[in-house]
Amino acid sequence: IIVGYRDNQLFLKEDLEENGTVYIATEDGSVGTKGNVMNAIEENALQADVIFACGPMPMLRAIKKYAEEKEIKAYISLEEHMACGVGACLGCVVKTKEVDHHSHVHNARICTDGPVFDAEEVEI
């Protein structure tokens, strides 16, 4: 389990430790690896069969790229402003590789089709 924080104001650490070894990255270096989760992965030479990630879009892009390079299956949880929450407004679409058979476009609605997607299937 790899988590990133801005500083030493950690939360959920004890809860996460109940599920396995926790590697921490902090932007200011006050706890764990200095930098972000990608720095923690590299510094600790971590390996995985599958990745589950949530967080800011730049991190998800880095995770997606890393997973593709290492041929690791990855699932990412996307966040977006959701005006309606039921898929009607299309305010939360993400571009996909597959064409939606209903709309005939390369989009998925994060609110109804996600929020978790196979990283290979979305373009972020």
Labelled PLM ranges:
Residues I1-H81:
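FNR/FR-type flavoprotein reductase catalytic core
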Residues M57, E79-P115:
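Local cysteine-cluster metal-coordination motifs and their immediate loop/turn environment
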Residues A119-I124:
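SAM-dependent methyltransferases
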